[in-house]
């Protein structure tokens, strides 16, 4: 099991492009960042022309917190151009790139310019190591998608964490640190397992985030306290 640095803690990001969900999660006082992707933006019903203004709204809503915005280009030049443009929208925007030849090349160019990159769609430890060496500030392994094909995503996550935490990444990216974002989270247990392994971050959709928050015994206890207090108040 990977050993965490003293004083570090699992951080919660929300995986959505929905402004209301982001505002609600932020109101809880424990939100540390946001991740988005083209599919999540499509779910908002927004138009293509509104994509960048929408990312800007998220960044403004979450000032000081990293907000990952993904490029849709498929070439190095396109990814770099998209990345530069998105990064210019707000200082807290992180550029999300897919792990592929073009993604690695674009990552190195953007990282050398001081732009933070979140390398996504990571499914193996070798991909994670390549991304970190190309300058990725964040690495996003997708645990839930392993479950979809009856494989163990948590064991793959464990390998990635061990490999990344074995090394000092000083000078490789703008911050000299590589953080692992556990992504494609479907259940509260995914979050627990990520925390046990020492992942830095879990990015969680609102549905799963509420599963992390609520428990039937907690809900029953709150209802009982409220009922008892109402009897006291009405006595």
Question: Regions from the language model: what does each represent?
Answer:
Residues 10-14, 18-22, 28-31, 36-109, ...:
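Active-site beta->alpha loop and helix N-cap motifs at the rims of alpha/beta catalytic domains
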Residues 15-18, 72-77, 97-101, 119-126, ...:
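Glycine-rich beta-to-alpha transition loops that act as phosphate-gripper elements at the mouths
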Residues 20-28, 78-82, 106, 124-134, ...:
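Catalytic cores of alpha/beta
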Residues 33-34, 38-43, 121, 138-150, ...:
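Glycine-rich phosphate-binding active-site loops on the catalytic face of alpha/beta enzymes
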Residues 37, 95, 131, 194, ...:
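Conserved, mostly hydrophobic/aromatic
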Residues 52-67, 104-117, 153-176, 180, ...:
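Alpha-helix-loop-beta-strand connector modules within alpha/beta enzyme cores
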Residues 121-156, 160-163:
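Histidine/lysine/aspartate-rich catalytic loop segments that bind and position anionic ligands
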Residues 164-235:
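C-terminal alpha-helical cap/extension of soluble enzyme domains
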């Amino acid at each position: 099991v990977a050993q965490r640095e003293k004083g570090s803690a699992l951080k919660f990001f929300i995986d959505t492009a929905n402004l209301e969900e982001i505002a609600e999660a932020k109101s809880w006082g424990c939100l540390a960042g946001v991740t988005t992707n083209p599919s999540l933006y499509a779910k908002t019903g927004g138009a293509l022309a509104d994509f960048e203004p929408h990312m800007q709204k998220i960044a403004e809503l979450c000032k000081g917190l990293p907000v990952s915005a993904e490029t849709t280009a498929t070439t190095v030049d396109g990814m770099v151009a998209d990345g530069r443009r998105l990064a210019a929208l707000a200082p807290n925007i992180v550029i999300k790139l897919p792990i592929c030849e073009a993604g690695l090349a674009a990552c190195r160019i953007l990282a050398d310019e001081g732009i933070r990159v979140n390398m996504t769609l990571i499914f193996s430890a070798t991909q994670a190591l390549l991304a970190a060496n190309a300058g990725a500030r964040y690495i996003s392994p997708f645990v839930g998608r392993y479950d979809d094909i009856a494989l163990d995503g948590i064991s793959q996550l464990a390998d990635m964490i061990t490999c990344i935490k074995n090394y000092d990444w000083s000078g490789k990216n703008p911050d000299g640190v590589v953080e692992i974002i556990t992504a494609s989270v479907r259940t509260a247990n995914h979050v627990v397992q990520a925390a046990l392994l020492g992942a830095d971050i879990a990015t969680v959709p609102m549905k799963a985030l509420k599963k992390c928050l609520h428990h039937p015994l907690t809900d029953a206890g709150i209802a009982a306290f409220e009922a008892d207090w109402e009897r006291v108040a009405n006595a």
